[in-house]
Every structure is written in structure tokens, then in C-alpha cells.
């Protein structure tokens, strides 16, 4: 009996560092062995764009010589356009990254990388966001290899429904990683103060302050795993409902007067 060839995956890649980012190029090259790779990414750095979607202006795209597609928009725009109109075929999975810098704890609320994965999940696809820790960004290949392994695992076992994986990888050679840890989000202290300066014309300008230092970073958190040279895998969900608050809210809502 003739064996039927296993169909190859079709992967959609995006990021928030921009279409020319090193991490994106290395990820695309590594994942090409798994199937067809489509890259649709912002035309420039869009870090911190979160889930913003452009609704009040047209979006221009450009087909680059290397086969990637550049979008004059946010990471969410990129994934939305790719899935709903730009790509000729529906992808099987969305992978966002490799981000230059970690997305830990409260970072996920602002991250364009996580938002790109989340948009894929909104549109019904399995989705991963991957970020490289540290500040020097030397070992993108390590993060790419981790993603390669995870995708192979997901192919066999699938993801739980409505789950996004937020993956953070230490900036180390692969051989120096201490393992994989399933983690929860930690938290940071409040952000550093806004920085006020004066421009050359004498007008005040402002810079958003740096992210706050680690606060909740004990065992079980994404911070802890990364600090101990482990890959952090945090399952995220789209449902933001605070179910534990229902009873308390219900008790005082009854006392409201119409």
C-alpha cells in the first residue's frame, strides 16, 4: 500500500521589531524545514504597539525581494491582513518573533509580539509568541531551535483551545539551557517616572519611563525560569473576565438604584 505523504505546515510569521529584524530572518530560515513559511511584518519597529488595529487609514503593503511582505501598520494589522485577505492560502499556525528582548509578566499587555500571536488566536489559529532574553541578543538560533521543537510537539498533541503560548528563551547557547518550564506570568513594580526634556525650540517633550523591576518573580513565574536559564512557556488566554470578582460585584450591584 502506498503511503500518503504528510502535508507540510503553512506557517505565518510576524513580529514587532520590523520586517528587517535579525530574529525574524533567523526564525523564517529555521522553520522553512517544517513547511511553507509566509512572512508578513511591519515596515519598521513597532515595539509596544500592543493590540492596536488601524481603522482610520489605508494600509500599504510591499512585496520584498526576499519574499517577505512589508506592511505599513502594526503587528496586529499584519496578522489580520495576512489571514483575511493577503495570503492565497490559510496558514495552519501563527508564530510571532523572535523578539529582541523578553516579554515577561506585565510586558505582555504592551507587547506587539504577543499581540500578533493573539490576533492569530482571535482568527482561529494556534499561535506562539517567542522572545529572546537579555540585552545583547547573541543567540537567536537558540530561540529558533526551541520554537522548531515546540511546533513539532504541537503538531502531535495540539494546543488546548483558546491558548496562546508566550515563550521566553535565555540568550544562551542551546547546550547551556537548563530545560523547559511551564510558568505563570510574574509582575513588575510600577514603571519608572516619565522623562521630561526640552527640545531645541524650547518646547517640553516626554519619554515614557523604563519598565519597573521584577516584583512577583518567585518559583513558578516566567521571571524565575528565565533567571535560572530555563525556557519559560506561559499559556495565555484571550478571556480577560475576572470570574472571582462575580460574587462581590453581584452583592453591591443589587444595591444600585435605577
UniProtKB/Swiss-Prot annotation:
A divalent metal cation binds at residues 16-17, 47, 99. Its cofactor is a divalent metal cation. Binds 1 divalent metal cation per subunit. It comes from the Bacteria. Pfam families: SurE (PF01975). Keywords: Cytoplasm, Hydrolase, Metal-binding, Nucleotide-binding. It is found in: Cytoplasm. Its main location: cytoplasm. The keyword DNA-binding does not apply. The keyword Hydrolase applies. InterPro entries: SurE (IPR030048), SurE-like_Pase/nucleotidase (IPR002828), SurE-like_sf (IPR036523). GO terms for cellular component: cytoplasm. Transmembrane segments: none annotated. Its EC number is 3.1.3.5. One of its GO terms (molecular function) is 5'-nucleotidase activity. It catalyses: a ribonucleoside 5'-phosphate + H2O = a ribonucleoside + phosphate. Nucleotidase that shows phosphatase activity on nucleoside 5'-monophosphates. Belongs to the SurE nucleotidase family. PANTHER family: 5'-NUCLEOTIDASE SURE, 5'_3'-NUCLEOTIDASE SURE. HAMAP family: SurE. This is 5'-nucleotidase SurE.
